[in-house]
Amino acid sequence: MITPETRPADSGDDPSTLARALEPVLIEACQGKLSDIEWFHADWQRGGAATGHAKWTENGNACPVIIKLPVGGIELSWTARLGDHGLDRDVRVGQTPHPTPRVFHSGAELGEYDLGWLVLESLEGKAVAGDLSASSVKGLIRAAAEFHARSIASRPDLGSPPATRDWAGIFARSRVSVKENRIPDSQRWNEAIRVVQKALPRMLARWEARPINTWCHGDLHPGNALHMPGDDGHPDRCVLIDLALIHAGHWVEDAVYLEHLFWGHQDRLFGIKPFSMLRKERKARGLDVGEQDTELANIKRVLLAAAVPRFIGVEGDQKYVAAALEKIETLMGQLSHL
């Protein structure tokens, strides 16, 4: 969230202290185009990043910017790679919005530190998480499709996906959690997980044979996108932020991840189906879609659903947990051919 609600940075906050100490070096690295920086702490921030407001002046034109440091290698590389485009504020109706922020400058070092940093266009939007509507959800999914298109165009060599998670271990702990946490419908849960465990080798064999056809965002949730409503000739649009978990994979991973966040609360999707809409948006952009997509999505849904008891208390509520159980019971029948 590039321009969220903020509070002044606490003087004892280590990232901000380091950022202030490095501010003169950062301004010098930007060749005098960056103004003095007002450091702040954003409500959405996780981890040890410092963030600041400033202005970037070039050819007599000043633009509000956000400075972020330190930035990890994956986020730095991809944000810079995809941020070489025009300003969001210049996008007009009829044009395709940029899926990620404009990057004015970036680097992997600052002074004597190996420390990644970014200077980004400041966006006047709200996080989709705090602005849920049909238009913001659609904008998020369109931005994901455009991200898929631009990322594969900029780096066609996908390489290998991350190693498969230890699903067998996760599901074993899920069964223990069902008992220890006295999860409602415990007998149904135990039976559902048992069925998944029995089919797991076949499901994983199918999953691991999936086509690797995109760079997945990896963390596609409403807190990682800004929504800018359309006005004054600008289109309604969303911009994705936090590109730290990008990885090679199959596009259904992003779709199902977003979808599963709303299990038990589908009303907050306003009738929008993330899998169906993302598939449609990818197809419209000439990106790979296939007949196996639904089956792969169902496998991913089952894997996530059977893991829910393992992470009880970390995410979800009773409606979410109940919906996850229903997913397993419904989808395992559809996957019985595996």
Describe each PLM feature range.
Residues H53-W56, L69, H105, S122, ...:
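Conserved hydrophobic "DFG−1" position in protein kinase catalytic cores
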Residues P64-G73, E121, D242-A244:
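Active-site ExK catalytic segment of metal-dependent nucleases
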Residues Q45-W56, N61, P201-E253:
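Active-site acidic catalytic loop and adjacent metal/ATP-binding pocket
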Residues M1-H41:
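Juxta-kinase regulatory segment immediately upstream of eukaryotic protein kinase catalytic domains
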Residues I66-L115, G130-A143:
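A conserved alpha-helical element in kinase catalytic cores
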Residues P101, H105-G107, G130-E191, P211-N213, ...:
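A cross-family kinase active-site recognition segment
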